[in-house]
């Protein structure tokens, strides 16, 4: 892929297969998660990846009456163990995916202000913004906490050409010109190339109308 001019900017689903470990469950679980993330960090470094995404809801399900401080301290510890060129981005996972901690962009941004580490940032995700009806103007107040950006659609299907997507993609372009935008689509066994092609066509149509 290097010889063909491809660059890998981000890694998603970094904790796939480790869903049983939860940052709120125990110190043992947090240490195991940290160990996995250290290994992912090395893989990302070797691939030249800039962003790794913390997104799985099962790794962060918050039990009743537990303090956010457990998570704040955990992500500060992660910060110390990342390569200087790698940023971990926390993705908001809406409640419809059985998540109850950092479910929307506003919550993630407020949390990151408490973590206060330059290499622990927010991943803007178009699908999450749509599901949560996030306030785009609020996001701009915390612009320095934005790391990676995913253009995705509901249920991770192909990116549609519609007014809501136009509004959000135009917001991304207008306010995050220096960022690399990546398309996130869930693969299937039948028509991956077709879904990717149609998504790129629809995104280009939106960009050209901007």
Model region roles, listed by residue range:
Residues 1-5:
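Aromatic-lined substrate-binding rim segments of carbohydrate-active enzymes
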Residues 9-11, 52, 88, 149, ...:
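Hydrophobic residues within beta-strands of alpha/beta enzymes
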Residues 20-121, 131, 195, 202:
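Active-site acidic/histidine proton-transfer and metal-coordination neighborhood
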Residues 14-17, 56-60, 92-96, 126-130, ...:
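Active-site-proximal loop/turn and secondary-structure-junction residues that shape catalytic pockets
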Residues 34, 38-42, 48-50, 105-210:
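Histidine-acidic metal/acid-base catalytic patches
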């Amino acid at each position: 892929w290097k010889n063909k001019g491809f660059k890998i900017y981000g890694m998603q689903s970094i904790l796939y297969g480790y869903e049983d470990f939860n940052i709120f469950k125990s110190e043992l679980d947090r240490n195991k998660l940290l160990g996995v993330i250290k290994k992912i960090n090395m893989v990302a470094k070797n691939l030249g990846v800039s962003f790794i995404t913390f997104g799985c809801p099962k790794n962060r399900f918050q039990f009743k009456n537990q303090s956010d401080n457990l998570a704040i301290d955990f992500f500060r510890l992660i910060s110390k163990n990342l390569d200087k060129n790698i940023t971990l981005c926390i993705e908001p996972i809406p409640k419809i995916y059985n998540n109850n901690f950092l479910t929307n962009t506003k919550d993630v941004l407020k949390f990151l202000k408490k973590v206060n580490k330059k290499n622990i940032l927010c991943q803007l995700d178009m699908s999450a913004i749509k599901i949560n009806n996030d306030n785009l103007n609020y996001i701009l107040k915390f612009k320095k906490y934005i790391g990676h950006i995913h253009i995705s659609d509901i249920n991770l299907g192909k990116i549609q050409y519609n007014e809501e997507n136009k509004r959000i993609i135009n917001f991304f372009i207008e306010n995050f010109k220096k960022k690399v935008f990546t398309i996130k689509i869930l693969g299937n066994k039948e028509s991956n190339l077709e879904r990717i092609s149609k998504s790129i066509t629809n995104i280009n149509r939106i960009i050209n109308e901007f």
